[in-house]
């Protein structure tokens, strides 16, 4: 009987200590919280070269913070990495310029980025014409 009472008291003590530790951990996380609601974020600056992992600096009143960010290596530098566009299909090849053109409309501006409403992208016309394959290679019906 005494062993059972000891185990119950021990269990209650362990639960009380662990809940207090969790409460302290939660309060510790709140210390860094801010009253600011109007954050102004700068553009993502890569750590090396012109794409990959980087940092973005934000300010609110007299407070400054840095966030980790990432610039995809296939982004269009003219548009900015924080501006997301929905693009149409590529147009026909222009024989005089030797390029195909397509336009995109702004879908989303991240971190209050200053983005153009519509943009145009161009790429050189391909020299080869793609032909449809007549049969599947590899695994399949034989």
Swiss-Prot record:
<dbReference type="GO" id="GO:0007528">
    <property type="term" value="P:neuromuscular junction development"/>
</dbReference>
<dbReference type="InterPro" id="IPR020091">
    <property type="entry name" value="PTN/MK_diS_sf"/>
</dbReference>
<keyword id="KW-0339">Growth factor</keyword>
<feature type="disulfide bond">
    <location>
        <begin position="44"/>
        <end position="69"/>
    </location>
</feature>
<keyword id="KW-0929">Antimicrobial</keyword>
<protein>
    <recommendedName>
        <fullName>Midkine-B</fullName>
    </recommendedName>
</protein>
<dbReference type="GO" id="GO:0008201">
    <property type="term" value="F:heparin binding"/>
</dbReference>
<feature type="disulfide bond">
    <location>
        <begin position="51"/>
        <end position="73"/>
    </location>
</feature>
<dbReference type="InterPro" id="IPR020090">
    <property type="entry name" value="PTN/MK_C_dom"/>
</dbReference>
<dbReference type="InterPro" id="IPR020092">
    <property type="entry name" value="PTN_MK_heparin-bd_GF_CS"/>
</dbReference>
<feature type="signal peptide">
    <location>
        <begin position="1"/>
        <end position="20"/>
    </location>
</feature>
<keyword id="KW-0358">Heparin-binding</keyword>
<keyword id="KW-0044">Antibiotic</keyword>
<keyword id="KW-0732">Signal</keyword>
<keyword id="KW-0217">Developmental protein</keyword>
<dbReference type="GO" id="GO:0005576">
    <property type="term" value="C:extracellular region"/>
</dbReference>
<dbReference type="GO" id="GO:0009617">
    <property type="term" value="P:response to bacterium"/>
</dbReference>
<feature type="disulfide bond">
    <location>
        <begin position="36"/>
        <end position="60"/>
    </location>
</feature>
<dbReference type="Pfam" id="PF05196">
    <property type="entry name" value="PTN_MK_N"/>
</dbReference>
<dbReference type="GO" id="GO:0042742">
    <property type="term" value="P:defense response to bacterium"/>
</dbReference>
<dbReference type="GO" id="GO:0008083">
    <property type="term" value="F:growth factor activity"/>
</dbReference>
<dbReference type="GO" id="GO:0043395">
    <property type="term" value="F:heparan sulfate proteoglycan binding"/>
</dbReference>
<comment type="function">
    <text>Secreted protein that functions as a cytokine and growth factor and mediates its signal through cell-surface proteoglycan and non-proteoglycan receptors. Binds cell-surface proteoglycan receptors via their chondroitin sulfate (CS) groups. Thereby regulates many processes like inflammatory response, cell proliferation, cell adhesion, cell growth, cell survival, tissue regeneration, cell differentiation and cell migration. Inhibits mesoderm formation and promotes neural formation during development. Plays a role in development of the neuromuscular junction (NMJ).</text>
</comment>
<comment type="similarity">
    <text>Belongs to the pleiotrophin family.</text>
</comment>
<dbReference type="InterPro" id="IPR000762">
    <property type="entry name" value="Midkine_heparin-bd_GF"/>
</dbReference>
<dbReference type="InterPro" id="IPR037122">
    <property type="entry name" value="PTN/MK_N_dom_sf"/>
</dbReference>
<keyword id="KW-0964">Secreted</keyword>
<dbReference type="InterPro" id="IPR038130">
    <property type="entry name" value="PTN/MK_C_dom_sf"/>
</dbReference>
<keyword id="KW-0497">Mitogen</keyword>
<feature type="disulfide bond">
    <location>
        <begin position="93"/>
        <end position="125"/>
    </location>
</feature>
<keyword id="KW-1015">Disulfide bond</keyword>
<dbReference type="GO" id="GO:0007399">
    <property type="term" value="P:nervous system development"/>
</dbReference>
<dbReference type="InterPro" id="IPR020089">
    <property type="entry name" value="PTN/MK_N_dom"/>
</dbReference>
<dbReference type="GO" id="GO:0051781">
    <property type="term" value="P:positive regulation of cell division"/>
</dbReference>
<dbReference type="Pfam" id="PF01091">
    <property type="entry name" value="PTN_MK_C"/>
</dbReference>
<feature type="disulfide bond">
    <location>
        <begin position="83"/>
        <end position="115"/>
    </location>
</feature>
């Amino acid at each position: 009987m005494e062993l059972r009472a000891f185990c119950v008291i021990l269990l209650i003590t362990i639960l009380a200590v662990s809940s207090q530790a969790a409460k302290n951990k939660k309060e510790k996380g709140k210390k860094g919280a801010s009253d600011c609601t109007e954050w102004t974020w700068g553009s993502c600056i890569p750590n090396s070269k012109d794409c990959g992992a980087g940092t973005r600096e934000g300010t609110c009143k007299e407070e400054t913070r840095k966030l980790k960010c990432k610039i995809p290596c296939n982004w269009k530098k003219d548009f900015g990495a924080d501006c997301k566009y929905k693009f149409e299909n590529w147009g026909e090849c222009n024989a005089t310029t030797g390029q195909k053109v397509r336009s995109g409309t702004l879908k989303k501006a991240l971190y209050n980025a200053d983005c153009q409403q519509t943009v145009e992208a161009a790429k050189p016309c391909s020299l080869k014409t793609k032909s449809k394959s007549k049969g599947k290679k590899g695994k399949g019906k034989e």
